[in-house]
Amino acid sequence: MNNAFKDALKAGRPQIGLWLGLCSSYSAELLAGAGFDWLLIDGEHAPNNVPTVLTQLQAIAPYPSQPVVRPSWNDPVQIKQLLDVGVQTLLVPMVQNAEEARLAVRATRYPPAGIRGVGSALARASRWNRVPDYIHQANDAMCVLVQIETREALKNLPQILDVDGVDGVFIGPADLSADMGHGGNPQHPEVQAAIEDAIQQIRQAGKAPGILMANEQLAKRYLELGALFVAVGVDTTLLARGAEALAARFGAEKTDLGSSGVY
């Protein structure tokens, strides 16, 4: 067993990604052929569940793009279900401290290293027990990315980085800017300073920094600073703005809804 996304992060190769919120295996497969290194299937803010995640994993599987899945919460039961349908890389939201980071790691490991329930005879991940010695190989193939999105998490970042099994730390600029009192403005100098400092801390600890930023200039800036997994757009935004722009070119009134630049 291997995890190409985890291997790329370990090798220090920057990975460029796209956020998936349409909950569609059809659009997921379309985007899997677009050339992104990874695709984030969002279960926190998009209406995904285990069956819709599964169909998107199946759609992406023939392509080089690697799937990353964000559950709605740091919940071992939900994580267990996602791992059983074949998720290897998780982005766990709203991790505030080392204890919560350890819980996320333990949820992805079989005992005695963790608390993942054993049900490989029912699991796509083990090819229904057709993968030899799956239970003893699975732990090493897991990639755990934890998401820091508050001032509290930033304060606890050194301890989070000390947690064995955390492969990367993802900075959530939308929630972080809101928590810092600059909601809707992740480009505020105070927020940017916090993000840049966090990227440096994560790199110095030997972990992979990640972020979502649809602002191309800022996304490239984060890559220059050492971010290793950067999502540079969102499928819903690409579809909505592209459709609006096309309609506007043929006379439709264009409404400026504004954007934080994150999504």
Swiss-Prot record:
UniProt xrefs under HAMAP family: HKHD_aldolase (MF_01292)
Function according to Swiss-Prot or TrEMBL: Catalyzes the reversible retro-aldol cleavage of 4-hydroxy-2-ketoheptane-1,7-dioate (HKHD) to pyruvate and succinic semialdehyde.
The name this protein goes by in its record: 4-hydroxy-2-oxo-heptane-1,7-dioate aldolase
Manner of cofactor binding, per the entry note: Binds 1 divalent metal cation per subunit.
Metal-binding in keyword set: yes
Pfam families xrefs: HpcH_HpaI (PF03328)
Complex formation: Homohexamer; trimer of dimers.
PANTHER family: 2-KETO-3-DEOXY-L-RHAMNONATE ALDOLASE, PHOSPHOENOLPYRUVATE CARBOXYLASE FAMILY PROTEIN
Swiss-Prot/TrEMBL catalytic activity: 4-hydroxy-2-oxoheptanedioate = succinate semialdehyde + pyruvate
Gene field: hpcH
E.C. numbers: 4.1.2.52
Gene Ontology biological process terms from the UniProt entry: 4-hydroxyphenylacetate catabolic process; phenylacetate catabolic process
Positions of the catalytic residues: H45 (proton acceptor)
Site (Transition state stabilizer): R70
Annotated a divalent metal cation binding sites: E149, D175
Enzyme class, first EC level, given as a word: lyase
Recorded family membership: Belongs to the HpcH/HpaI aldolase family.
Cellular component terms (Gene Ontology): cytoplasm
